[in-house]
């Protein structure tokens, strides 16, 4: 993930006041007063910002660009009101890209147009005004999402969006009919457009609340830190209090798209690792420094951001929940809620009840371990394909995939929950027909959480109401299906399934009403037409190239999306519409008989033209059209009104007639009234789901849970996985363990089968693994760590038999170090990472270490390796796998220096090489007791293509 560093910005720049400013008003924009108050609020911090080098984006331009700008830009006092508004926004949001809607375009102005137009690959030009030229660039409104991705995800900018709105009770032909206001500020953590498209991942925004003035003291690993993270696109929100030593593990588990920090921390550069080395991991993330809100704002003032089934119920549940939070958790929660509401001022936020996560309930996996084990992406190319998540994913719903990712990042420490998952997986594994039927049903389910959030935001198509209803209907069917098969379950599992599926019993009446009163077929057609139009716009097809005749539509009976029987008002509107339509039909028949039958025209059609005129379209021969012209020239009345020529050609006539004009306008007005009433009904249905947010989310959670566990059953059958025994012991016993991803890679390339190995660890013994280069030592270390993770998420594991005592923390020092510690040697980085293990591992932890001490001289490296091994065994007493090339040396030191008791606790195992005769050999990855005496480095060099002369020299030196 790209790190982007932000300079401080005032936390509440604009959301308290709705910015409204007409593009043609001559008065000074209202933003000016707001800006003054903003400066007063920020006055105490202004000197600090200057000292820290606060950057105005205008100063980022080249000298040549500055010269160009200064020579063409009008003075601020002479700017037209619309541009004055843009300039004031740019001054207020100095570190943001400002996109302002002007008609059907979003536009950039002044120095921002010069800077960002090339990055967006859009044309840069100048617009002339009475006092000079202004640089500007823009793109169509429908391309907003595409350009936001470029600005936010690719370039790492924050984007302020000012949308255009029509004033109420203002005629369309008035000049000052529009005003603009900031509707949202887009950052990686509030980029809802991207989140709604990327269904498989969470878009988490994380706030970290450090104790006041803690940076001025030496870092204390037992320092308590409050964190809050949320996904605005799903409504999930969590809080947790962690110790400083566990903070980075929590960040790694959450995988936030954006991290929010107090601007007061900026001067300490905490991501440099100077104050606390492990915080160097923050460099991997998008960091936003913000002026935090006043502590005087109570947490109760945020109740409006939640909907738990009515105002009273919401307040009651939140009060109970908030009482369980610590002060640091509440502070982090408050900061997060203000940030979200400030960045989405035009959106109705709808969070679920905040969930408190406990460090004692989740396995801690730091970022180095997550990377080394390739949990979410591969080390080599940072690709998701080939990762553990990719290898085990068999989920069929977006919510199931997100849940699987969350579980991999933070396996459970709750033995009861793990065993519950195992029982459900075992049932699905043994009953394949039931599993396949369940998964077929799950495939019909849409992403309920995100559809619900769309409704809350005032977004979401009417078709998504159908999708919501169908999904909830399927959830009821799933519940019924599983309950009908409980006879195959044991009593405990039967009770668990019954309790689990209770939430799937969503209110049937609401589902039935939506499916009864909404026209699903018409909605699907409308959606297809909209998507085709979007594709056309994306391809920049110029509709002006279409023929004129294609612009003018035959006036046909409209297909409406709500059943007229929904209410009396809609029924009456439809009855009136049908009555007018009948008149139109009769009128059309009369005119067709007149023009075609009496005057000899070829065709006659009633149409609505592109310009809104209701016209008669007649085609015919020259003689028949001449008759029509003569009739019109005589002002002959037809049913009390004359015909008038609107447009003519050699073969056509466009005519107007009062009756059709009146009928057309009446039909259009009725159509508009029906559409408005339908929109009200659609909003009513959306509101009913919003009012049942808690129930909808419970359904989504349960469906994701069932999807994930049933996917484990499918995986177990595919990959020959077994149910591990998970308990409270300190054991790790694996028989014929395998590495899932390596095994999958070998199988895909039709290479040799994977060599399985045993492992037996406890707190009072430690395995030292030796072997040649490429002998499989690192693979063995990783596979056992992965088996532990799989076991504690409730998945079956790749082996013949396994016993896993609950692991609270998983540590690794495997592979090359990340390039995060500037100006530090590889060995120094390895020592820092090893020290984290020695300081953090408990007797319930698992540590895998590879080649400790390799980055320095042989003697010193051996001493470091021995000291690490001894400390882990005697002090940490954690389960440890220790791979090294110093096997003989360590064995000798242990025998000479340590007691017999310690000597017996260290077990040495080796892999090796099998000679096949001549210069041929193969690796033997099967571990056996003993110490590998040589690493066969020369053979590896030979495989790598070393020149023969160099190989000969190496063999001679080796003797």
Curated annotation (Swiss-Prot):
- Main location (coarse class): mitochondrion
Subcellular localization is given as:
Mitochondrion
Q: Name one GO cellular component term.
A: nucleus
Superkingdom of the source species: Eukaryota
Gene Ontology BP terms: DNA repair; mismatch repair; mitochondrial DNA repair; mitochondrial genome maintenance; mitochondrion organization
Q: Where is the transit peptide?
A: 1-21
PROSITE patterns attached here? DNA_MISMATCH_REPAIR_2 (PS00486)
> What, per the annotation, is the impact of changing residue 105 to A?
Increases the rate of point mutations 35-fold and displays a significant decrease in respiration-competent cells during a time course
**Which SUPFAM superfamilies has this protein been placed in?**
DNA repair protein MutS, domain I (SSF55271), DNA repair protein MutS, domain II (SSF53150), DNA repair protein MutS, domain III (SSF48334), P-loop containing nucleoside triphosphate hydrolases (SSF52540)
* Pfam families (alphabetical): MutS_I, MutS_II, MutS_III, MutS_V
Keyword list, A-Z: ATP-binding, DNA damage, DNA repair, DNA-binding, Mitochondrion, Nucleotide-binding, Transit peptide
- One term of GO molecular function: dinucleotide insertion or deletion binding
Positions annotated to bind ATP: 771-778
Q: Which family does it belong to?
A: Belongs to the DNA mismatch repair MutS family.
Record note on quaternary structure? Homodimer.
**Function text:** Important for mitochondrial DNA (mtDNA) stability and repair. Recognizes and binds to base-base and small insertion-deletion mismatches in mtDNA. ATP binding and hydrolysis is crucial for function. Binding to a mismatched base pair attenuates ATP hydrolysis. Also involved in proper sorting of mtDNA during mtDNA transmission.
Give the free-text miscellaneous remark of the entry: Present with 1670 molecules/cell in log phase SD medium.
Name of the featured protein: DNA mismatch repair protein MSH1, mitochondrial
The organism's taxonomy opens as: Eukaryota, Fungi, Dikarya, Ascomycota, Saccharomycotina
